[in-house]
């Protein structure tokens, strides 16, 4: 379950923003990473734990504790933000840019290539989504292990290679010059995992119930445990990716 939750959390933004921190923070990298971890790991953990411990049936039920109009507004705003407004387009464009754009003919019609890739990408996503009962198998047992294997190879190869310039002597850029912690803090929030945790938490609850755990207290404890393990692992990945990016300048 923790592996599945990690796979749900770790999307395009989880590679973009730690990489940017490594490239721009320079010698202020560690204070920037601390800020990144607070909002990129700490807030998602609190979100998953809140949904599990509240024993709510979903985001709408949780936000209904304020009142129903607020619940409708907050639920719609959150799903639009982590869905069609920001996160969904980012997943397709980053996958295309990182995975295909560099090997396609540079004199070709990139907009057409992106359109075709996007259609194929979201058709595949739709096929997975139509079988929610298989999400633990597809994400937790198949996609996530392959992703971690390839990412691990990339991180190890980069970290064992000597850096051209020591990170401690690299000048920071942009907001990392004066406010590295705050800039990293904002970058961690930009992953949008703090918002996504409120949506993913109910998926964890449903999967735990499908595994035969029905007692509310046990469901809450197992949800919190899944959140802790997945977020700790995500934090380790953030540190590794940031360090890798810093060494590859």
Identify the role of each PLM range.
Residues 20, 71-105:
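Hydrophobic transmembrane alpha-helices that form the core helical bundles
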Residues 58-64, 237-249:
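TM-loop-TM module centered on a large, flexible mid-protein loop between adjacent transmembrane helices
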């Amino acid at each position: 379950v923790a592996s599945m939750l990690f796979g749900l959390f770790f999307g395009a933004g989880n590679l973009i923003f730690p990489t940017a921190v490594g490239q721009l923070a320079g010698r202020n990298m560690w204070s920037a990473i601390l800020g990144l971890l607070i909002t990129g790991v700490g807030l998602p953990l609190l979100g998953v734990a809140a949904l599990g411990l509240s024993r709510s049936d979903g985001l709408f039920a949780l936000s209904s504790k304020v009142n129903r109009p607020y619940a409708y507004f907050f639920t719609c705003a959150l799903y639009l933000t982590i869905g069609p407004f920001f996160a969904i387009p980012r997943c397709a464009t980053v996958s295309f840019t990182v995975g295909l754009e560099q090997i396609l003919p540079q004199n070709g019609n990139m907009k057409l290539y992106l359109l075709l890739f996007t259609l194929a990408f979201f058709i595949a996503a739709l096929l997975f989504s139509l079988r929610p009962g298989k999400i633990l198998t597809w994400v937790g047992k198949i996609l996530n292990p392959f992703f971690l294997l390839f990412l691990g190879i990339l991180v190890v190869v980069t970290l064992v290679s000597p850096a051209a310039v020591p990170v401690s002597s690299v000048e920071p850029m942009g907001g990392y010059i004066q406010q590295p912690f705050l800039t990293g803090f904002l970058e961690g929030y930009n992953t949008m995992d703090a918002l996504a945790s409120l949506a993913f938490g109910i998926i964890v609850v449903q999967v735990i119930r499908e595994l035969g755990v029905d007692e509310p207290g046990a469901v809450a404890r197992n949800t919190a445990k899944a959140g802790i393990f997945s977020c700790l692992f995500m934090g380790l990945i953030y540190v590794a990716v940031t360090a890798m990016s810093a060494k590859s300048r």
